[in-house]
Amino acid sequence: MRKRRKMLKREYDIFKYQNNSTSLMISFFDPYYQTLCEFFDTEVHNFYPHIQKELEAVVTGQKEESGFGGNMLNIDIGKEETEVYYQMDDESLGDPCFIPTEELYKLVLEWKEMEDEMHSGADIFPVTLED
């Protein structure tokens, strides 16, 4: 029997801007995933339906591979693994990172659930998850 890999330890919190608007933030405890944090904060925040659709198409086998290009970051979605990287070739922005595609898909769905919780006014933040 294959041992199930734990998902990344992460924390969701709410960032409040001066104009009283809020944004969901996700942080991963492993610094390797800093670029992934940026991907959620900029791209998933703005383009959730498109990203979810492309990941789902690969995870369910409708497509062998796919990709998405956002405002700052891109993802190359493979059957087993997805690369998250900055569009600009500038190492000061952050290094690319790789994550199992199915895990990224689950994290994107979870992020949407957390965003819905935030908008409902749920008093659960900050919340740390590791499953």
Residue positions per predicted region:
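Short, highly charged C-terminal tails/helix-capping segments
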Residues: 120-131
